[in-house]
């Protein structure tokens, strides 16, 4: 267990956080479609990043494209609201991926808020690429 904590600290994570418009079934479903589109869009680059800074730089350089990607999914599925993409430091609960535990705390992330952003959220660790593998 100690090794898990040490490994997590050695590779400071960068996260993806998507917040649905509401808890309604349609809003929750489109949140997952946005997730799939964003993970597909970033898969090659995110898995090639050597460190958190490189992953964050990629997200910063492509922030408008990532927001457009989310908005395209929303429009294609008949939603009138849009997505807002931001980079920042946000609170997250603890999470274990295999043998690596990331404790609860503030982490750097790409956050996509869909519409009002009042629904259940989905998140993962993009670097190291744990939600891509």
Kindly give the residue locations of the regions a language model identified.
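Hydrophobic membrane-insertion alpha-helices, especially the h-region
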Residues: 1-7
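Secretory/periplasmic and organellar redox-cofactor proteins
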Residues: 8-14, 98-102
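Early exported N-terminus immediately downstream of N-terminal targeting peptides
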Residues: 12-63
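Solvent-exposed loop/turn segments at secondary-structure junctions
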Residues: 23-24, 90-92, 130-132
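Mid-length scaffold segments of soluble, non-membrane domains
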Residues: 56-121, 125
């Amino acid at each position: 267990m100690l090794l898990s904590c040490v490994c997590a600290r050695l590779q400071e994570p960068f996260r993806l956080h998507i917040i649905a418009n509401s808890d309604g079934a349609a809003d929750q479903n489109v949140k997952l479609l946005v997730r799939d589109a964003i993970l597909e869009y970033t898969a090659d680059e995110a898995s090639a990043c050597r460190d958190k800074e490189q992953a964050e730089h990629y997200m910063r350089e492509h922030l408008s494209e990532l927001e457009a990607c989310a908005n395209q999914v929303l429009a294609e599925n008949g939603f009138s609201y849009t997505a807002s993409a931001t980079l920042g430091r946000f609170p997250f609960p603890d999470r274990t991926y295999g043998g690596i535990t990331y404790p609860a705390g503030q982490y750097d992330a790409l956050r996509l808020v869909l519409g009002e952003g009042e629904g259940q959220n989905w998140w993962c660790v993009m670097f190291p690429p744990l939600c891509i593998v």
